[in-house]
A protein has these predicted regions:
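Binuclear metal-dependent hydrolase catalytic cores
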Residues: 2, 22-211, 220-222, 286, ...
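Cap/insert and terminal regions of metallo-dependent hydrolase folds
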Residues: 207-209, 217-326
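Sec/Tat signal peptide C-region and signal peptidase I cleavage site
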Residues: 18-20
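Bacterial N-terminal signal peptides
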Residues: 5-15
């Protein structure tokens, strides 16, 4: 009798707790199927800096990676992001889609590395590359330069027997507008102001929007592209350094690059959730930018300031969230 009473009481308590025993319990919300990450593969300038590779940024959506620019060291930085940051989509063989902002050497010197190393690492399909006029010619010349290597690796009677597709490149010369779209991302190009034909890119994914300026002075097109974006990646240089440039370089910079004051004003109008400053003429190396926060003239002719100068100058004029990007940062 006591056992029967205990069973009935237990059932009643269960009913009181769960309500209707036939009604399924609520389930935890499912995670989003994708999570977009921004990986800074290179934040440097034309001046060699051991801490900073040439400009290169990866937008990673799930298992897919999309590169913007391929400066010196891009593939090795991608491998470092794989090994040190766990970004598996950046395995070199998986680097299959890339965009270039303009054809200056500091943004493109890693192009042959991207083509050839990705192929020898196992890429089995042609790489798709998008950029301004001149990209096709650059691509053809790179492939011709490595013709003997390609022939040696693909000869049927040879020992290497590399696949015959992974070295190929489909180069697309673009204009403003939507230039790429797949199941996870839409990429829109917009014109920027630099020394040659140049573009910035906006990436729209299921969970984030990312805008990358490339080299440019501040433009209304960048502000329009960034309206409501989650992340804006933009170049900048410290006013303290800029004001000490020789007149000819100051004139070039005024028309083709962005100062700390200007990036603060631009971001105030564009209102990104996060501003990432990259391709800044700064260095963490005292021999390149001394701790006294004064620019220094290198033997290469480059001028750099220390990062805290740039941080201070932007912070004095911009109230939004911003960071000074470093290689292998993930956001």
């Amino acid at each position: 009798m006591k056992l029967t009473y205990f069973v009935l009481l237990s059932f009643l308590m269960l009913f009181m707790v769960d309500g209707n025993p036939q009604e399924p319990k609520s389930q935890a919300p499912k995670e989003r199927p994708t999570r977009t990450r921004v990986v800074l593969l290179g934040t440097g300038t034309p001046v060699p800096d051991p801490d900073r590779s040439g400009p290169a940024t990866a937008v990673v959506v799930g298992d897919s990676a999309y590169l913007v620019d391929f400066g010196p060291g891009v593939v090795r930085r991608a491998e470092a992001a794989l090994l040190d940051r766990g970004v598996t989509a950046l395995e070199p063989a998986n680097l299959k889609v890339a965009f270039v902002t303009h054809l200056h050497s500091d943004h493109t010197a890693g192009y042959s590395d991207l083509i050839m190393t990705g192929w020898t690492a196992g890429r089995r399909t042609p790489i798709e590359v998008y950029g301004p006029t001149g990209l096709k010619s650059m691509t053809e010349h790179i492939l011709e330069a490595y013709r003997i290597d390609i022939e040696t690796r693909t000869i049927p009677t040879g020992d290497q027997r590399g696949n015959r597709e992974g070295w190929r490149v489909n180069a697309h010369e673009i204009k403003s507008g939507v230039v790429y779209k797949d199941a996870t991302v839409k990429v829109t190009a917009f014109p920027t102001q630099h020394a040659m034909e140049s573009y910035g890119y906006r990436f729209d994914t299921p969970d984030r929007s990312v805008v990358i300026s490339g080299d440019s002075s501040p433009t209304d097109e960048t502000i329009k592209a960034c309206k409501g974006c989650d992340v804006l990646i933009h170049e900048a240089r410290a006013m303290e350094m800029f004001n000490q440039l020789p007149e000819d370089r100051r004139s070039f910079g005024a028309h083709n690059h962005t100062t700390s004051e200007q990036v603060a004003a631009l971001a105030t109008k564009a209102k990104p959730a996060l501003l990432i400053v990259y391709h800044a003429w700064i260095s963490w190396w005292p021999s390149i930018a001394p701790s006294a926060n004064q620019p220094v003239v290198l033997t290469t002719g480059g001028f750099h300031s220390s990062p805290d100068v740039l941080q201070r100058e932007i912070g004095a004029r911009y109230s939004g969230h911003f960071v000074i990007g470093r290689d292998l940062d993930v956001y």
